[in-house]
Amino acid sequence: MKILFAVSEAFPFAKSGGLADVAYSLPKALRNLGVDIRVIMPKYSDIHPDFTTKMKHICHFTVPVGWRNQYCGIEYLNLDGVPFYFVDNEYYFKRPGYYGYYDDGERFSFFSRAVCEAVYHLDFDVDIIHVNDWHTSVIPVLLKAHYGHSDKHNKIKTILTIHNLKYQGIFPKEVMYDLLSLPDEYFSEDKLKFYDAISFLKGGIIYSDKVVTVSRTYANEVRTLSYGEGLHGLLSGIGEKLIGIINGIDYEVYNPATDKLIFVNYDSNTFENRKKENKFRLQQMLNLPVSDEIVLIGMVSRLTKEKGIELIERIINKLLTLPVQLVILGAGDYHYEQMLKQYAGAFPSKVSANICYSEELARKIYAGSDMYLMPSLTEPCGISQLIAMRYGSVPIVRETGGLKDTVKPYNQFTGEGWGFSFANYDPAELFATIKYALSIYNDKNQWRNIVHQAMTQDNSWNASAYEYQKVYESLLNS
């Protein structure tokens, strides 16, 4: 089978969030299973010259964008065994950053149409186009509307992965007419119409052959009013077309046994003393009292309501009366940034607020923390809890989305489980869960068992890639 993976960003070329990590790691894992998958993405001007100088120009053609024909070049680079195609157009992509421009509707209309046109020109007989989030969700629509006559296109199946339903690519209806060249019939409730505008993501949900969210629980949540972002009715109505496949993490990148960014390397057999050394050195680095009796709770997160910072604000005064240190890394809403800075100033022996992002400090927090906090309001999948488990930091999570699917709550009677969880978005429940985790921490045998279970869970991309391979096979056999 031949899969074209269409995405707006991919590590290490362009990254603004977790989508880029998926676009690098999932194709790599699928190729290890023997799937011929290739990635296609925009050639942004921010891509490092170390990569652009190695790209090979393979073809160029014009792409219809409304009444105009725009130049499109295709460049190629193989990275870690994965072929990448880059869509080159300086008018749309020679700018700082990736998103947030007034003409994003036009930019990603062009990119989506360019992917469709590229099928004519690539030496690659595409069976499935795998699209991701709103940026490429209009590709299945375009295939049905404009390419039904093409022998190269009419056999192509499509799969859409929704990484976060909140971002839907909502644009004025003129984008549909003037840029996508779609007739009036597409501006209807059963097609692209979303209130008085159009939604790229809605089009992808309707016209793709399969829809995947990034966890089983999130696949159920998005069918409800609370999580459906206005599309719950549509998602409830597509039945088994919608499934959930949990994301993984790259075990070569996130490996405490080889990670050069942490103080001391360790694995699931040697963590007990070596992880403690990471904790002590992190405490020293952040000017916190060095002690193993004090529980170091880590958090690497955007500082937003969605990530549960509101709950932390509600309990922080009570939390700081307990034998804990709170180490937070991230940036976000000004209110939360200032709140954490104030507590770090008032309680310098208890709180370290690092209002920035540093991959090196993030790794040191994963390796040096005893517990890892993710009290999210919403979390489609969540990657941080998987990294924390890999590094032996026991997650405390709210039971939502991928957090519910990946963190099994510890049962002190059976000894099973590798984390702690609470159900409702409620500060009292979060505080009670932290207190319970602290009581278990004091029993070193129980805690050692929990950490070992967390570190030995398989959250690599292997299982996820196998699930996607099965979906691809089912589409080709349908």
UniProtKB/Swiss-Prot annotation:
Enzyme class label: transferase
Alphabetical GO biological process terms: glycogen biosynthetic process
Reactions the enzyme catalyzes: [(1->4)-alpha-D-glucosyl](n) + ADP-alpha-D-glucose = [(1->4)-alpha-D-glucosyl](n+1) + ADP + H(+)
Entries under CDD domains matching the protein: GT5_Glycogen_synthase_DULL1-like
Binding-site positions, ADP-alpha-D-glucose: 15
A GO MF term: alpha-1,4-glucan glucosyltransferase (ADP-glucose donor) activity
EC number(s) stated in the UniProt entry for this protein: 2.4.1.21
UniProt keyword annotations, A-Z: Glycogen biosynthesis, Glycosyltransferase, Transferase
Pathway entry: Glycan biosynthesis; glycogen biosynthesis
InterPro entries assigned to the protein according to its UniProt record, in alphabetical order: Glyco_trans_1, GS/SS, Starch_synth_cat_dom
Entry function: Synthesizes alpha-1,4-glucan chains using ADP-glucose.
UniProt similarity note: Belongs to the glycosyltransferase 1 family. Bacterial/plant glycogen synthase subfamily.
Protein's name according to its UniProt entry: Glycogen synthase
Organism, as annotated: Caldicellulosiruptor bescii (strain ATCC BAA-1888 / DSM 6725 / KCTC 15123 / Z-1320)
